[in-house]
């Protein structure tokens, strides 16, 4: 799959680019037969890796948001299924398809998980292979989800970094704003938007990052801040409601976000609050860039109107670390995502090039 979609901007990528992995936190540990994931609900107070032994465990850690981030949950779901298939002595296609659908239901908005797991179905439904060959092909495919993510993430970060150099040729260092967590805790490599920020810092092209706390789940303050502290990246944490004032009073050059689901026309679903940032960027004439791997493109939907928005429990808004901060009887609306319309997006930065939204559909690899 990777060879079909690679489009490296201003390549080749130098070996020195983001070579120091000691500055990176690891979201999981996998040795081929054992999988452990970092329990992100315990961060920043405790770093604890918990075992994932199969599909049920993978579903649980994804559903509970012990792991989160579209690329990461795709890998965890795939490896959870791989661990079960590795133990199987014979193929049970119907059971595997049931497990695929079960895993996909854990986070319905995040398309990476769906895209990755649905890629198994043509193998299972093929009449060209014996059951023994199908089983081996399934194992190989699921392992490749893990290995491909590392390769594609490096290309994605490089391409996006090159776009920023081109967009701001007269600026030595950039001031960037971001939301949620899109770094190594959301992927198995450097990350999407935060990976680009880490690249800017490593190349001495970053002045400052404004990090939104990202209510109600606080991924900015709990996760992004510890990644940036660990990497010694200059940043300031702000509340979500401070974004407009920060844009007005400080020179924010661009906003970089991740994405969980991108329609063919470029409409982009991401963490709730992203649409707000895009509207503010339009008003303040600031570039707005989603940083998006190929696996996040949803070729099955034409516009953002078709994206199903997950709604989370009211307790996630009313409680912080288990402590009730509002009346337990408060009525709550808690969508996990919003959709930014394509016309508010400067470019969508991908591992197959950097594209204005209106050009995305014709550039999506087949």
UniProtKB/Swiss-Prot annotation:
An example Gene Ontology molecular-function term: S-methyl-5-thioribose-1-phosphate isomerase activity
Keywords associated with the record: Amino-acid biosynthesis, Cytoplasm, Isomerase, Methionine biosynthesis, Nucleus
Residues at the active site: 260 (proton donor)
Compartments (UniProt record): Cytoplasm; Nucleus
Coarse class of the protein's main subcellular location: cytoplasm
GO biological process, one term: L-methionine salvage from methylthioadenosine
NCBIfam families documented for this protein: eIF-2B_rel, PRK05720.1, salvage_mtnA
HAMAP family tied to this protein: Salvage_MtnA
Family to which the UniProt record says this protein belongs: Belongs to the eIF-2B alpha/beta/delta subunits family. MtnA subfamily.
Full protein name: Methylthioribose-1-phosphate isomerase
């Amino acid at each position: 799959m990777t060879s079909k979609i690679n489009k490296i901007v201003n390549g080749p990528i130098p070996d020195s680019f983001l070579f120091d992995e000691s500055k990176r936190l690891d979201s999981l540990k996998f040795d081929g037969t054992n999988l452990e994931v970092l329990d992100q609900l315990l961060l920043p107070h405790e770093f604890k890796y918990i075992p994932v032994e199969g599909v049920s465990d993978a579903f649980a850690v994804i559903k509970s948001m012990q792991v989160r981030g579209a690329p990461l949950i795709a890998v965890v779901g795939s490896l959870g299924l791989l661990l079960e298939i590795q133990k199987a002595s014979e193929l049970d296609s119907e059971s595997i398809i049931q497990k695929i659908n079960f895993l996909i239901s854990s986070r319905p908005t995040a398309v990476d998980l769906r895209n990755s797991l649905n890629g198994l179905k043509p193998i299972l439904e093929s009449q060209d292979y014996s059951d023994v060959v199908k089983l081996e092909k399934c194992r190989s495919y699921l392992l490749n989800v893990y290995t491909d993510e590392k390769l594609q993430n490096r290309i994605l970060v490089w391409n996006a970094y090159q776009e920023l150099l081109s967009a701001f040729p007269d600026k030595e260092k950039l001031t960037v704003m971001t939301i949620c967590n899109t770094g190594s805790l959301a992927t198995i490599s450097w990350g999407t938007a935060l990976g680009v920020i880490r690249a800017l810092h490593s190349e001495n092209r970053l002045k400052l990052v404004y990090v939104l706390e990202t209510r109600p789940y606080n991924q900015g303050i709990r996760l992004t801040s510890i990644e940036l502290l660990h990497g010694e990246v200059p940043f300031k944490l702000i509340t979500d409601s401070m974004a407009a004032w920060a844009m007005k009073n400080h020179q924010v050059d661009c906003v970089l976000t991740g994405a969980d689901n991108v329609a063919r026309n470029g409409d982009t679903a991401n963490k709730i609050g992203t649409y707000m940032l895009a509207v503010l960027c339009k008003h303040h004439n600031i570039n707005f860039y989603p940083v998006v791997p190929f696996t996040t493109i949803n070729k099955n939907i034409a516009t953002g109107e078709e994206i199903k928005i997950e709604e989370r429990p009211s307790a996630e808004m009313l409680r912080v670390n288990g402590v009730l901060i509002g009346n337990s009887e408060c009525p709550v609306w808690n969508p996990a995502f919003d959709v930014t319309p394509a016309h508010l997006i400067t470019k969508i930065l991908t591992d197959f090039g950097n594209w204005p939204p209106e050009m995305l559909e014709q550039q999506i690899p087949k």
